[in-house]
């Protein structure tokens, strides 16, 4: 299994993409909205990807809910994480969050997609990049809601990825556009932002972690996604995490501080990442594949989905019909709530 996760351009593979997917360093593929037209087309694209790849790839998507849901038409419209507690309270919201985790995972597994990069464990709604993607402004409540969501995901056969370690919730800048800096004392980050990660790791509920492209300037001059301190010292040694560490997308401006594409990829692997994401830049991806030394990402093979349900079976089930309706209603309530603020 190779350590590089790539993307593809459209609704079906072109000849160059088939060739790239056969490269031994490619171990994963992430899908975006541009890859989706309808469920049948998506299923065929996944089949093409599987048949073209040398390795048994981990196929991923960001299907969190709210504003980050890559596949919408033909799938349940998932509400933003914040809406569960904000509109339903912790108890009823937690119950529906667990059902949301189950339904999201089932809908993706029916497409033969292994993981959705979820849930978001960032605390609070200040950050432009996070906002409603966070379950709550209190770390204990983020933890409680995330536990329910992950329980649902895992019951469907999907592994959970917590993001963005050690916490992106307190910085207003968007790491897709620049390198955010969080100047808060290390003790505050550890006590506040890291709590959901720390506790979920102790419960053995996180299968993977995605670090933040944020510089925590009181701690380390490198963004967490390229920092041996955060990934090896804190995440691996202090917290005892033995799951998969993903880099966030090395094409984001927040990663530019790490150098060229090949340098960014090597830096992320050297820092402790198991798998690096290189998206939205074909030349950058090819550069990484051409320049990385051969390496195996053995932990990543743990992330294959374990589900066997078909789309037809899922949508015929009473549970899916009930939960899909409840989630759609909450999504619509949340849109109305936001419009009235």
UniProtKB/Swiss-Prot annotation:
GO process terms (BP): carbohydrate metabolic process; cell division; cell wall organization; peptidoglycan biosynthetic process; peptidoglycan turnover; regulation of cell shape
Keywords: Cell cycle, Cell division, Cell shape, Cell wall biogenesis/degradation, Cytoplasm, Glycosidase, Hydrolase, Peptidoglycan synthesis
Catalysed reactions listed for this entry: Hydrolysis of terminal non-reducing N-acetyl-D-hexosamine residues in N-acetyl-beta-D-hexosaminides
Primary site of residence: cytoplasm
Compartments it resides in: Cytoplasm
GO molecular function: beta-N-acetylhexosaminidase activity
InterPro entries on file: Beta_hexosaminidase_bac (IPR022956), Glyco_hydro_3_AS (IPR019800), Glyco_hydro_3_N (IPR001764), Glyco_hydro_3_N_sf (IPR036962), Glycoside_hydrolase_SF (IPR017853), NagZ_Beta-hexosaminidase (IPR050226)
Pathway it works in: Cell wall biogenesis; peptidoglycan recycling
Active site residues of this protein: 176 (proton donor/acceptor), 248 (nucleophile)
Site (Important for catalytic activity): 174
Catalytic EC class: hydrolase
EC number: 3.2.1.52
Residues involved in substrate binding: 62, 70, 133, 163-164
Xref: Pfam families: Glyco_hydro_3
GO cellular component: cytoplasm
NCBIfam families membership: PRK05337.1
Family named by the database record: Belongs to the glycosyl hydrolase 3 family. NagZ subfamily.
Function statement: Plays a role in peptidoglycan recycling by cleaving the terminal beta-1,4-linked N-acetylglucosamine (GlcNAc) from peptide-linked peptidoglycan fragments, giving rise to free GlcNAc, anhydro-N-acetylmuramic acid and anhydro-N-acetylmuramic acid-linked peptides.
Protein's name in the database: Beta-hexosaminidase
Organism of derivation: Cronobacter sakazakii (strain ATCC BAA-894) (Enterobacter sakazakii)
Gene: nagZ
